[in-house]
Amino acid sequence: MLEIQNLKAGVEGKAILKGVNLSINAGEVHAIMGPNGSGKSTLAQLLAGREGYNISGGSVSYDGQDLLELSPEERVCEGFFLAFQYPVEIPGVNTTYFLRAAVNALREHRGEAELSAVDFLKLMREKIQLLELDESLLKRS
């Protein structure tokens, strides 16, 4: 599903990734661990499509397509994105509204019908119960 072969990349003339190889099959979960400066964040940002990195070699394919050729927006629709650990609050936009917009954008990309507010709230409640989260999450900004 995700295949990284001999990926070499850097920023501002400094080599950071020096031949990364990684294969992740559908349904697998992997953790990328290592000391500070080993390239974990660089790899994540490259996969998400952040600008400013120079790729000097290697390839990244996802589900048979060249991930490096996709725009950041296209990568998001394929499931590659970075989320902030402590996101900035956007005044007037609550978590439920934000998540519904994100889910519906993904559904549109897949050719699926948009979820109504009622259907999305039902889905959110199911997932909140499944994950044993507090329902106050629905009202959080």
Language-model features and meaning:
Residues 33-35:
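The feature captures the beta-strand-to-loop junction immediately N-terminal to the Walker
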Residues 31, 76-85, 125:
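ABC nucleotide-binding domain signature
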Residues 48:
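Helix-to-loop junction immediately C-terminal to a conserved catalytic motif
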Residues 24-26:
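Conserved hydrophobic segment flanking the Walker A/P-loop of ABC-type ATPase nucleotide-binding domains
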Residues 59-75:
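ABC ATPase NBD Q-loop/coupling interface
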Residues 88-141:
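ABC-family P-loop ATPase nucleotide-binding domains
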